[in-house]
Amino acid sequence: MIAKEYESVLKNHLSHAQYLLLVLLIGVLQTVKDVKLEHIAEALPLPILFESRRRKLQRFLDWQPLNIETCWWPWLKSLIAQHWPPKAVLYVALDRTSWSCINILMVSVIWNHRAWPIYWTLLDKKGSSNLAEQTTILLKVIQFLEGYKVVVLGDREFCSPKLGKWLCEQKVYFCLRQKQNTNVQQDSVWLELRELGLTPGMSLFLNEVNVTKQQGFGTFNVACKWKRKYRGFAPDEAWYILTNFTSVEESIKSYQKRFCIEEMFRDLKEGGYSLEAAKVEGDRLHRLILLIAIAYVTASLEGKTIQKMGLQKYVARPEKEKKQTRRHSSFYIGLHAHRWVSQWQNQQEIVQEIMQINRHKLPYYRKGLRAMELIQSTL
């Protein structure tokens, strides 16, 4: 349920009772797929009163040593070392998600068409983040990823040339999408990016141009591309990417990876753990996100292992042969494997009876039981 190499990290910072409670909570998250405290307390398998379980959960989320630096980063650093060699290129996406009065700024590393959260902060305001908030969180991540080549990806909220200049000073690569009305100076003439004349299927690379009419930022490269119509779909507008890469292809290919963090947010919300249903704020929410991050990465790794074994067809609908995009992510496979195994354990006697009634299908059932054993070994 929790990787063995992570057990030692947690046991160094948690008491044995706290460690066991965390393991229970991760297991509950994988099966109920809901982070509302009442729903977690309902499913928490402790033989005490419901209200006692709820208060126990609240006290756990109030425990200060449960934080990113001590209980998350050691395992994440180990995982990154396992999946990327030293000096490898790591794509990290900076993005913000919000609902109600909650506003979260997060940086994640791109992995397997999804993203792993590295660091996050709760903004005490509504709306966009500012440069100070962006550079503060990015500096922590850049220092954490020392020894790797970091590429920072950001959408139009993070379009500021000030951020681009700061990233240049940190000696990291970046791809920051620009708004269409951003001004660039080309051949001594100022133009808005949308006035460059791009049409679907066209691309353009502006080398070392001034971006915005404000002074003191130096020059940047701007990669421009408007994707052609494909399968009846055409983007409404072109992409304009502020970057320190030297080609359109490299810039666009890198920026496309940014959408993996949006898939991750979808997994954390309605596609997985229903984060928006959480009725907690402040430090409790911060630590709840930490629990979700542990559960999310754990399920993703388990799903990847199940896919490598070729057993995903026992957990979810099989992929179509001619379909270019995957139907299910490794996270989806891992999360739903927990549900399948859990139901088998709860209904084992009934299933055994059904198998005896349908004896002509016993060879298929035996294959399924073997698959169940192998899948259980990954969880």
Show the residue positions of the predicted features.
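Short, charged amphipathic recognition helices of the HTH superfamily
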Residues: 32-42
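Short beta-strand scaffold segments in enzyme catalytic cores
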Residues: 105-109
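Single, function-defining residue in the core of a domain
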Residues: 1-34, 71-73, 87-90, 101, ...
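Amphipathic alpha-helical interaction segments
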Residues: 39, 56, 289-293
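Active-site- or DNA-interface-adjacent structural scaffold in DNA-acting proteins
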Residues: 27-30, 44-100, 154-155, 168
